[in-house]
Amino acid sequence: MKICYIADGSSIHTQRWLNYFAAKGHEVHLIYWKTRPGYHETLRIHLLQRFAPKIWPVTRYFSFLQWIFQIRKLVREIKPDVIDAHFIIDNGLLAACSGFHPIVVTAWGSDVLIFPRRNFIWRIVAGFVLKRADRVICDSEVVKTGLLSLGTKPNKISKVYNGIDTSQFSPRRADEALKSRLGISGFPMVICIRHLRPLYNVEMLVKAIPLVLKHIPQARFIIAGDGVQRSYLENLAATLGVSQNVSFVGYLPHDELPAYLASSNIYVSTSRSDSTSLSLQEAMACELAPVVTDLPANREWIIDGENGFVVPQDDHRALAEKIVYLIENSETRVKFGKINRKLIEDKAEYEKEMGKVEKLYEEMITASKMGKASQGH
């Protein structure tokens, strides 16, 4: 197959998705204005050019108009079998304006759950893109419901997970040298891997830490991620007197995550909105016990008291209580971890999920060719 993607080239999620198909021998093209190292050697990257004046928001909209013409030209040259645009609002619109079919649009979460609710223009854009799309991929029931509310026909929607490489994300990846370097050997370790932005509400975890330390002074916390709130959160930790127990390690390359997760005991996510969280699934694959906020997408994976705990949003006291319980009750923690590993192996293994996408592409290409053939008679 010749597959053309319009997707954020700087995202690890894009890279993992595209590298699968390139490694399988498909001809893969990526169109975007920025990229990252680590793509498969056979993958072809087409960087969009920006010639707009450096005046915001003029730059954004002028560049977007330019990109439409650039993409139409690139698509004519590439002659793909299928286009898959990741993120509805911008990349989906570029695909919808490409003049090409068949088009797949892959929703990432906020493009359905947040942006269309903030602005009626984005809602109109989302509706237009979803109408033009031949198929739509999502990774959770809450996003599927959102797609339906935006007018997507049910038979267009396929639910597929990004998938976890269970050989890479495994409890066997525990790294004592890492724990020693971080100064946490022999201590219970809680980890949070989220962007440090208001949406992910990591402040809730920082506020919970003093309450945990009252009961378990030796507990250690790793906050992995970067963003506009990093300085604020570091200062908050200092103000609360917990800096000695918290390590802000910044953004971690994807290949370093397994060691951090497998060396931890408890995973925390405090997000205010989410689709299926890849970092949650990675933690589950490493047999961690999760404590997550009460979101529909989280409840698809975590049943409160059965394989983790679900706490109300913004309730740092409830979060602290569950963290303390899991540290003090190792049998429960281990039980949750074993259940979670099995769940990921059964429902979200990387090769299986990407195989579903591959089959979807093949079906669409076949249907498109049959449609064109029938029109020719």
Go through the PLM ranges and name each one:
Residues R272:
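Aromatic "clamp/platform" in nucleotide-sugar-dependent glycosyltransferases that forms part
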Residues D304-G305, F309-H316, Y325-E331:
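Conserved acidic donor-binding segment of nucleotide-sugar-dependent glycosyltransferases
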Residues A289-V292:
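Short hydrophobic beta-strand element within catalytic cores of glycosyltransferases
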Residues Q218, A318, Y325, T332-K347, ...:
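A short, well-ordered alpha-helix in the C-terminal region of glycosyltransferases
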Residues M1-P37:
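N-terminal subdomain of nucleotide-sugar transferases
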